[in-house]
Amino acid sequence: MRTHYADKVDSSLIDQTITLCGWVHRRRDHGGLIFIDLRDREGLVQVVCNPTESTVFKVAESLRNEYVIKVTGKVHKRPEGTVNPHIPSGEVEIAASDITLLNKSKPLPFNIDEYQEVSEEVRLKFRYLDLRRPEVAQRLKMRSYIIREIRRFLDERGFLDIETPMLTKSTPEGARDYLVPSRTHPGQFFALPQSPQIFKEILMVAGFDRYYQIVRCFRDEDLRADRQPEFTQLDLEMSFVEEKDIQQLMETMIRHLFSTFLNVPLPDPFPRITYDEAIKTYGTDRPDLRNPLTLVDVTDLMKSVEFKVFKEPANNPHGRIAVLRLPKGAELSRKAIDDYTQFVGIYGAKGLAYIKVENIDNGTGGLHSPILKFLPENVIAEILKRTQAQSGDILFFGADKAKIVNESLGALRDRLCADLNLYEGQWKPVWVVDFPMFDREDVGDWQALHHPFTALQETDPEKVIANPGDVLSRAYDMVLNGSEIGGGSIRINDIGMQYAVLKVLGISKEMAEAQFGHLLMALQFGSPPLGGIAFGLDRLVAIMTGASSIRDVIAFPKTQTAQCPLTNAPAQVETLQLETLGLKVSKHRK
């Protein structure tokens, strides 16, 4: 039906007759002429309808926004002063010789150009209209281009695109599984995969050496601000590799994507920091290195002070006291400090002590703080020295369990940087390495910080069982601007070590056989050294396109309550369907 897309219409086509198809983006009457902005997937073209073409003009008069049309006409240069430099077709217009109305549109629930005033739920309910907005469509096109380039990159390096099952077995991977009842095996269930982890390891045992997949994953977890119950991963695995092999390849890929699509050079190599360094310095294992603010530990200085708020956590083996220095922050108002105090309370902090450094040369006389009277002068002097405080700064203190201090001051660090626009540079990638293998609260069972198939730096299973808290893993996360975009590890390929890890996690040999027997069996038939990584593709595309949420780069996302306003899913099903599956709904949970 068409000869061209909008982005191909330019001055090279002047005096040629072409045909376009699309939607009426806007219709304007000016001095006897009707102008139509025709929109297709690739952009906008201005169409001019002259009353001398009576049939065309009559159709043009009847057109409304979002009507579907086909236009044939000759390409002309726009009159002087009417060029639009913001679109590829901005130097030309189409003098319509024929317009065909292909379909009408009902009155719109919202104007395509006025989406800012429309709630997200309404936009998702009418997602097919929301997707007509050029900026939304552009993000989905960019997603397609990025995926295509990723495939090309990996194909050229010997990776095989292999699909793994969508209907698999429920295993304890952290979040709840989405379960699928089996009609042919009453009382039994499939699970939708949280990741292809076990299958990709088995593919390495099978000898495929280099695997990748753009794969959908599912997690029935309590949704946080920017999570989806179904999401897309770039998943890959390699045999006969060490950490550096995977990291170097993935750095090359990410550098290539940023160079190709954003014309942005990323560092070579990416910097590396340990998990311990990240937590102590930034309060998080996903540090935004554009942010110059850092945490400084002063726990040792507070062990002998009389101030209980500091002394108790300083003498608690699970406690921490840290200081966050904000340069030129002494000008913050009391209200601003109160707001930040309330903010850190979200993360469990009981307060936010502070010292304003008004004049560093006047000693304690140049400081202002409600806590000064509780601290010896030598301690205050050492705090100022460690934090490299200057006149005009403010020092914020966190004192509690280390987890609370890290999370609250880490979040405050991010908040201050955003509020005051302290960012240095645009893109700061980093590898976080040397994660603990296991983690737990003060008391309680050990949990795998990543997953139970992660290889360990310790090679003796007995030492792992004896001192799990001392063991580091061979895991690595790629972090970009404070977002984890990829995470992976070298995997365990020794059955004895795998049983040791499962034992630490409280999983008996019998339970392990029941849950992971297929993997444990495979490990006994010549498993090569192997490792891999998975990238959150939604997050990566959102970062690269500047989207504020991953929902903006997913064609049909769920809401924050895991619902689809477009289809009204999830929904009830017929009783007969439940009976066929041997299911019965006992009650509705609110």
Swiss-Prot record:
Function in brief: Aspartyl-tRNA synthetase with relaxed tRNA specificity since it is able to aspartylate not only its cognate tRNA(Asp) but also tRNA(Asn). Reaction proceeds in two steps: L-aspartate is first activated by ATP to form Asp-AMP and then transferred to the acceptor end of tRNA(Asp/Asn).
Positions of the UniProt region annotated as Aspartate: 197-200
Keyword field contains Manganese: no
Protein name: Aspartate--tRNA(Asp/Asn) ligase
Oligomeric form and interacting partners: Homodimer.
Localization, UniProt: Cytoplasm
GO process terms (BP): aspartyl-tRNA aminoacylation
Annotated positions binding L-aspartate: E173, R219, H450, R491
Catalytic reactions of this protein: tRNA(Asx) + L-aspartate + ATP = L-aspartyl-tRNA(Asx) + AMP + diphosphate
Tree of life domain: Bacteria
